[in-house]
Amino acid sequence: MRKFSCFVSAMLAGAAWMAAQSKPNVIVVLADDLGFGDVSAYGSKTISTPNIDRLARGGVCFNNAYATSATSTPSRYALMTGMYPWKNPDAKILPGDAPLIIREDEFTLPKMMREAGYATGAIGKWHLGMGKGKINWNETVKPGANQIGFDYSCLIAATNDRVPTVYIENGDVVGLDKNDPIEVDYEKNFPGEPTAIDNPEMLRMKWHHGHNNSIVNGIPRIGFMKGGTAARWRDEDMADYFVGKVKDYITAHADAPFFLYYGLHEPHVPRAPHERFAGSTTMGPRGDAIVEADWCVGQLIDHLEKEGILDNTMIIFSSDNGPVLQDGYYDEAVKKVGDHSPTGGRRGGKYSLFDGGTHIPLFVYWKGHIAPLNSDEFVCQMDLLPSLAKMVGGKVPAGLDGIETLDAFMGKGASNRKDLVIEAKSKVAFRTGPWVMIPPYKGKARNVTGNELGNLKEYALFNLVDDPAQLTNVADKYPEVLEDLKKRLAAQTDGKIVNN
């Protein structure tokens, strides 16, 4: 009888394990400012990204995938909520001490996955705010990722060029000495603290614009910071640190379905890849940082294989927005770009309404379940939330802007997305079929980075199939198309943000 009981217990345990494994693990890897043309799977001859290419060539490689926005915070907001970021006035590029812009009662991707039976983790770059304002970094900071659906988090609050330059695990600063408390201010410096303007002799990286406040590791940052010396990261070690956290998370959850959001910090500025990657390319620190990002992806894949769960893990790789070369530091990115096109020949880049701002790399890989496919289907990152919900049996509320299009993501059918409102710095454009329509906007043609912004004096209509570089405005040639797109954009935005 005892043997029979043990046998039954073993059978039940095995059945439970099989039930858990019937749902695939899901990992979303989101690079930072990585362009469509920066990945060798899309034809780059200058930079080799074999690990990212493994995902592209072993899964669905999308040629027509988009972020909602041409900058970080709004793009990430859309991914997490399935909602257009221009509907949230706080979804703009955030300082490092900004409050959380996702309400605690708001529906999110990690909440959906958790309710579907998944463990949920967030590791790497966050940039969606933390706390409620006036953050005390010396206590547990909340609300944050753990309050909007993640069981576990280990993050940087904003970007690697913004203070505080510390890791935050489940709301607590890692390695903080309470006798050396952290203070952060985005308006004024703390008495006696060095800055890039006052102490240029302390710099090992020269600032170009904006990055002239506190100095950490010889690198000037945005914002002022005091204290927390023992907790401050070394920029060159950041990739290794987060790869270690990713491996630990995977190992700890290898026997149950998990959802992991892995926010890479590369190739965002300051570009300070580990010394072992220095000189990996002819393009300086930006190229080397992309090689480091590719290494991170390789480490992820290898660890999934080591744990024996690669076949049961869907990996989704993308970037938050388009690329930028000169984004605040003199690091030779412009000088050494050569004939490499980070946007893959698209006009604009980060911050831009032109196609280079939101046309991003996107690959969906699931070994043994997704056949390799080069797809021209039109998809958006915010479509992942309802699509993953369908795959894992999750529930979503009515009214999401994301569209369920699982068949397209799996490479088994056409996309259900017909159009998209693209946003850049609170200005919008409208994308549908081969067309993109950009309303006229006031403002400079280029910002300080050198990227074109899409501020045009007249309505512009481009056919991206015939003219992917957007060199020819065909609004006069196709007036009926222009009028249709103008009406559709006004209807979707209630006419509130057109022609700001």
Predicted region positions:
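Hydrophobic h-region of N-terminal signal peptides that target proteins for export
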Residues: 10-19
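Cysteine-centered catalytic environments shared across enzyme families
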Residues: 5, 9
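Formylglycine-dependent sulfatase
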Residues: 2-4, 19-460, 468-500
